């Protein structure tokens, strides 16, 4: 069974596809890198403002940012 779970696997995958580091994402969201890293690990959940901004930055028009990746589904 995989340790990938919302939002970690999808958020990391989208960020890397866009070529952003955690530091760059944090800067764009005006939060600390640690806070952003906590979103990816699932230790913290982003507020609505940051969810909307992440979707804009990552080019996600729907709520795919919050769905598990295909790898996560197949590993369950």
Question: How would you name each of these model-derived features?
Answer:
Residues 9-28:
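Short basic helix-loop element that most often maps to the first helix and adjoining turn
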Residues 31-45:
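Recognition helix of helix-turn-helix/homeodomain-like DNA-binding domains
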Residues 1-2, 14-17, 56, 64-76:
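Short, charged recognition helix plus adjacent turn
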């Amino acid at each position: 069974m995989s340790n990938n779970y919302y939002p970690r696997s999808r958020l990391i995958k989208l960020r890397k596809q866009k070529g952003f580091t955690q530091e760059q994402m944090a800067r764009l969201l005006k939060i600390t890198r640690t806070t952003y890293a906590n979103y990816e690990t699932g230790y913290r959940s982003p507020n609505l403002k940051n969810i909307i901004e992440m979707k804009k930055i990552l080019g996600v028009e729907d709520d795919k940012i919050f769905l598990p990746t295909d790898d996560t589904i197949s590993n369950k």
